[in-house]
Amino acid sequence: MIPGELFIQDGEIELNAGRKTVTISVANTGDRPIQVGSHYHFFETNPALKFDRKKARGMRLDIAAGTAVRFEPGQTRDVQLVALAGKRMVYGFRGDVMGKL
C-alpha cells in the first residue's frame, strides 16, 4: 500500500439518494460573482441572488461535498437543491433561521 493510494470499486455512487430535491432558477442581479458552497443553506445566500427563497428553505445545493457553484453577474441558471439531513437545525450563515427548520 502506498500512502494516499485509493482502491475504488467498480460502479457508481449516487449522492443524496432518497432525499427530497427541487430545481429552481437563480439569477445574480449583483455586479460581482457569487459563489455558493455545497453545504451552505441556500435560503440564506447573498440577497443579490434572486430566486424563490421559500422553496430553498432547508435545502442546499445537490452537488458533491466541498464543491461550489459560481453565479456570474447577470447570469441566470437552474440549480438542483437537496434537503438538509440530520437534526435539520440551521445556525450561523446569515442568521435568518438560527434553529429548527
UniProtKB/Swiss-Prot annotation:
Protein name: Urease subunit beta
Main location: cytoplasm
EC numbers for this chain: 3.5.1.5
Family recorded in the similarity comment: Belongs to the urease beta subunit family.
Pathway: Nitrogen metabolism; urea degradation; CO(2) and NH(3) from urea (urease route): step 1/1
Keywords linked to the UniProt accession: Cytoplasm, Hydrolase
GO cellular component: urease complex
Source organism phylogeny: Bacteria, Pseudomonadati, Pseudomonadota, Alphaproteobacteria, Hyphomicrobiales
